Amino acid sequence: MTRPAASGVSRKLAMSTEPSSTGHTPPLDRLEKVQVVSRLLKQAPPGEFSEAFSDLRALVKDDGMMYEEAPGFCAIHTKDHFTPMEAEDFKVLLTRHNELEENRFLDPEGQVSFKYDHLKREPTDFQAHPEEDEGGELWRRELYKSLEAYVNNHYPKGTCSVFIKDTAVRRILVACIESHRHKASAFWNGLWKSEWTFALTPASTSTEVTGSITVQAHYFENGNVHLSVTRDVEETLLVTDEAQTARDFAKLVEKAENQVQNGLMEEYRKMNNTHMKSFRRQLPVTHTTLDWEKIVTGKIVEARAIL
């Protein structure tokens, strides 16, 4: 199985090999290489970080830099893609929102923290991390319960996490959803993720929810087709008690994600009738495909009549 190199990589890195007006080759310095590689690896399709890293390694021709910076590159990819981490008794998304310090993450459901090796994809050094704000934890737990029910009903393999950040005047709740399908054997990979944030103050009767929904897909059998869609959402959420607000929030997320999915399906339908039309053979004047089964059946009937 072959896979195309990362789009635009060779063009950008070719700058280091093209002669300048003075006849000399201006090489990229280390910092420039790190910046270029980091930017391109952030665009790596879901489930293809290792392949993109190998492509870039061959183009950069600086193994020392690549392997020294690999943990940092991988950490960015892990957090950007809301990578799920599953251990014996818990499952949590790895994001920038629950990174307590470099490479140490919090699982609010299990109330533990752990170190994570992004290259080996292994958690270690588990430590108890109880939530001190009991009132805030009640909001977070109810939100997680409603969101988990939504994810279980709408995703074949989905994961969600809810995090809380306390400030002097308000609580900030962040909810993340991730679902991926990696089918390299069938030449495609895909990811759906969304992130939702809103704040609560003691006198809150409503709050503004901001969300971002991202869909990525890559199909690479005899070609190289990328899909990358991001939709931003802003909605008002009524704040009552913890349980009701959590249920209303889950309904808000469901409505927004359904709109994105339906919009994508409508775009595919339009593309099928417009952009993709030129790639197909023309239909007969009836604008219907031939019913070969009906034709074959008719010939069998005719043959029997003759006999």
Map each language-model feature to its residues.
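Generic signature of intrinsically disordered, low-complexity, basic-rich segments
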Residues: M1-T2, S10
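Context-dependent free N-terminus signature
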Residues: T2-R3, S16
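Short stretches within intrinsically disordered, low-complexity N-terminal or propeptide regions
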Residues: S7-G8, I213
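A structural "domain/chain start" motif
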Residues: G8, K12-C160, T167-V169, N262-M265, ...
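Generic hydrophobic, helix-prone segments enriched in Leu/Val/Ile
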Residues: A70-C74, P84, W192-P202, A246-V253
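Extended interaction regions within the primary functional domain
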Residues: G135, S179, D232-T236
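Surface-exposed short loop/turn segments
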Residues: E137, R141, K145, A149, ...
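Short secondary-structure boundary motifs at beta->alpha junctions and helix caps
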Residues: N222-M271
